[in-house]
Amino acid sequence: TIHFLPFYPSSSDSGFAVKDHYKVANKLGNWSDIKNVSKSSDVMADMVINHSSARGLWFKNFLKKKEPGKDYFLTVNSKFNSSKVVRPRDHKLLKKIKIFKKTDYLWRTFSPDQIDLNFKNPSVLIQFIKIMIHLINNGVTIFRLDAIAYLWKENGSKCINLKQTHEIIKLLRNIINLLNVQTTIITETNLPEKENLSYFG
């Protein structure tokens, strides 16, 4: 098995601030290269599913309320209780933003350049199902779901390892089963053993 770290166009964090989830960065090659490798080895790729780049098309469209990108990113209002939130970095979590006269707060678990996606919007989930199928069609047989434990947020919770996240992973697994392809999902979950084990099966 060959694990390719994020090969998408990105703006920071060693490739994990993805600007376009459908492309291979020009400096790294193209989809034909990945397909060629997949002929002789299993290919594992990161699906950076929790967040996307603040410099990508989705976020630019989000600010303009255009598709694709409209309502793709997570914002909360001033009443949201984030006091229990668990996260790995210490920069300011929320950034005040005003879009078309409405003031909200952008959610940024990992960095100011990585804006968390809003999986309460079904369009975001549908988009990542399409991305997953696109990767399968281009030779990827193992998915590493990056930062998956942080995917879902609820007011007043730790915003990590919530049941809704598990349901989304199960849905992705069921779609793979329907496609009848030999594909494995691996979750990046840096959690205590009992919580880590909850992602198996």
Language-model features: where?
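Acidic/aromatic-lined carbohydrate-recognition and catalytic surfaces
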Residues: 1-129, 137, 148-201
